[in-house]
Amino acid sequence: MNVRLKRARELAGYAVQLTKDEGLPTMLKRGAGFVKRRCFGKRARYLPAKKVLEAQRAEMAGKTAADCGLPTISILTPLYNTPEKYLQEFLDSFVNQTAPNGQLCLADASDAEHADVKRIVEEYQAKYQRIVYKKIENKGIAANTNAAAELAAGEYLALADHDDILAPHAMYTMGKAILQLRAQGEPDGFLYSDEALFSKSIQRPMVAHFKPDYAPDYLLCCNYICHLAVFQKALWDEIGGERPECDGSQDHDLFLRLAEKTGGAAHVPQVLYYWRVHAGSTSGGTDAKPYVAAAAKKALADHLARTGCTGTVEDGLFPSTYRVKWDIVGDPKVSILIPNKDHTDDLEKCLHSIWTKTSWENFEVIVIENNSTDPATFTYYKEARQRYDGLQVVNYPQKGFNFSGINNFGRQYASGDYLLLLNNDVEVRNADWLTELLRQCAHPGGAAICGAELLYPDETLQHAGVVTGLGGYAGHSHKYRKAGGSGYMFRAATVQDFSAVTGACLLVKTSVWDEVGGLDEAFAVAFNDVDFCLRVRDAGYRIAWTPYAQLTHYESKSRGGDEKDPVKARRFAAEQQRLYAVHGKANILHDPYYNPNLTMDREDFSESNGLRGLKEGRITVQWRG
């Protein structure tokens, strides 16, 4: 099929799916943005400014890989019947790097009808000694990549496809990032960068993949690392390179095995790789290569076996995504804490949904009565205790509303292995909601906290994880987007790591709650959940979010903020400042699971205005385990 026609059909299919997922207005808005970027957008918007690249070249002028001061990175690229134009553009992107610390290792499995591949490479070899080449028998992508690795002389390796393009500062940036990690005393064995998709020219990229820092739960659901990944050759040798039995998802499999050895990875938020979209490429969707899913599930199942974990691997909610259904260890008891003041209609809806829909049987519910004034409320409590077996109602002794204090008080009556903070204005949607929350925590190496997908009654997202720094303090991922969509890089449809989740539905190990001292009562209304999650994260635990636990949250979308009441506004401002004081403003504004190239003004994962970090070629690197 003609490549342009193929691309047109892919875009049409994307538009249809986007309309189904998020509605016609969103599709039209997104489509207009695409046309604007493609036809009128600033050229090379993900590349550093020209003066930055010139400064890098000046710094490295006259130097070789041996004396440039940067670690040598050998790029492994299997060749197979590569179109001449694509091959030349790829080779040009290597030889035009701003630093000389790269080596290009080419293993050519092209058939006899594509002898021009060898001819073209040999022409470049005659000019550039940093290109090494070997003609090989075609044994599949993994084996061919392993053959390329046999040519490598570098301390580090990187993977690049034969039809893609390296950003001009890729080798310089990765080399400097490795030196930064060493200076900081952090592991330097495994790094990855951001990437962008393009069809014709990297001067007109289609979209960037701005990734989070290392996120192990997210990596189990999709290969978000992808390009450009750089890792020590010693690690590659230790794990035996790529596995042919995972052809199609060989890189995903490799990254899982590398992470098992390193315990994490370092992320460089620069676009260092351009992934070409054309007929037959995986960047165009796994429909082009359907064997990818089977290979990915094998890679994940083997990862579970190697790490001693038990569970099953299934397809995810969208193509290219997967789901690990962890086996829950034992029969943990969950204590559900529900603060309540009057509003018995909301509470009844909540309790009824818990008792009639929840498949997990080992739970208790503790309603924490907080200064109700309607006599009918207490009549309701009496009736509810008769209707719902085991329901407890305890009386919070303090006056006023303090969400933290109320839940801390309720903890005293809880006997569960886990606590579930739950608002009284939520309603259970799926029977295995509690099972799915437990699934992320109640297994060896599981998260300490897990949050749920909360939806407004109009089927838009209210909560899909919390991103710190949005709006200056914190915001909800993908808020107001139509439910059922994939979100940015599948982030509204996969189990993943977050810095925080909302206290409207938050499962936490009771032992961890006690370890960090519960909720901070200085956060009476706002940010108590964010503060709690950050303290748990700082104690070395992980926070997860799952789309497989769904509840309706009847919080009003149009509810006004506390700024309308002077007293509440002062309290809210004080809690904002306390969040900065306790955790540091810089830490709040840099959420490791949210890319610095994304906006801080909205909750839609759109690009930030200006992309200053990219234009300045700013080299920052963060290792996470």
Language-model segment annotations:
Residues 2, 6, 10-68, 289-331, ...:
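C-terminal, non-catalytic tails of nucleotide-sugar-dependent glycosyltransferases
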Residues 31, 36-288, 302:
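Nucleotide-sugar donor-binding/catalytic module of glycosyltransferases
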Residues 92-101, 352-362:
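Short, acidic, metal-binding catalytic loop of nucleotide-sugar glycosyltransferases
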Residues 136-152, 396-414:
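Glycine-rich, basic loop-to-helix element that forms the pyrophosphate-binding segment
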Residues 154-165, 416-429:
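Short beta-strand-to-loop acidic/aromatic patch adjacent to the donor-nucleotide binding site
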Residues 169-205, 426-473:
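Conserved donor NDP-sugar-binding/catalytic core segment of glycosyltransferases
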Residues 235, 245-271, 300, 433-438, ...:
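A short, conserved alpha-helix in the catalytic core of glycosyltransferases
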Residues 269-286, 316-322, 455, 521, ...:
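Active-site donor/metal-binding and catalytic loop motifs
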